[in-house]
């Protein structure tokens, strides 16, 4: 079996188990059984349940990055808005699993720490996909800030059953505008020129760019 196919099987097995039993059901033997893999193969892909969750995050990251960085002439906030909305699009099939996971999240510091590190890597990738630096002190602060933005937007996403995710867009847009006010401070912390990160194609959601522009005109 090809590695990519085995990895995808693990991702789908994690989703199914989370939907059924939340984190309580996420055990390596169950993941292997659901994925149709033996334990040694699973171990090479995801040696622990936390590693399997990190594998899921990388899978979602890949789906988002495939959409490209957006239009270079767009403001950074608009590029990041588009990238993050692509992330929530990719998470739509995971909504039931995420809801169940949120209800069954145990008070486990090691689990929380492992997932927090993985989330920071994902948010750094989202910034880079939007051609915003994630390196240096300013980059680290941007990553941490985007984690907070994502936490609020994800809560809205889990309660948002609209087809266009309008409630999610509203929260995300508002939080990004709040974060944007810190941009001058971050530039003073890290004044070096930004080296562009080229990922690929054009943005997927023109209507979402229009949403952001319309919100800006309403505020002004």
Question: Each PLM stretch: what is its role?
Answer:
Residues 30, 82, 86, 100, ...:
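Amphipathic alpha-helical interaction segments
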Residues 68-103, 107, 117-118:
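Hydrophobic alpha-helical connector segments
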Residues 13-17, 90:
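Short amphipathic alpha-helical elements of helix-turn-helix/winged-helix folds
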Residues 9, 17-55:
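Helix-turn-helix
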């Amino acid at each position: 079996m090809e590695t990519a196919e085995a990895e995808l099987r693990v991702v789908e097995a994690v989703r199914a188990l989370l939907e059924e039993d939340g984190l309580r059901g996420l055990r390596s033997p169950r993941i292997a059984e659901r994925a149709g893999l033996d334990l040694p193969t699973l171990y090479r892909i995801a040696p622990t349940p936390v590693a399997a969750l990190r594998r899921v995050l990388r899978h979602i990251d890949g789906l988002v990055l495939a959409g490209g960085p957006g239009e270079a002439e767009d403001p950074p906030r608009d590029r990041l808005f588009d990238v993050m909305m692509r992330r929530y699009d990719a998470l739509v099939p995971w909504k039931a699993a995420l809801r169940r996971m949120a209800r069954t999240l145990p008070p486990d510091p090691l689990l929380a720490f492992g997932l927090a590190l993985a989330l920071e890597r994902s948010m750094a990738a989202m910034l880079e996909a939007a051609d915003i630096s994630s390196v240096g002190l300013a980059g680290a602060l941007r990553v941490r800030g985007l984690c907070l933005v994502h936490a609020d937007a994800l809560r809205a996403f889990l309660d948002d059953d609209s087809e266009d995710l309008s409630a999610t867009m509203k929260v995300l847009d508002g939080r990004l505008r709040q974060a944007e006010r810190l941009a001058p401070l971050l530039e003073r912390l890290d004044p070096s020129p930004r080296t562009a990160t080229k990922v690929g194609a054009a943005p997927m959601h023109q209507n979402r760019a229009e949403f952001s522009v319309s919100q800006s005109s309403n505020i002004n």
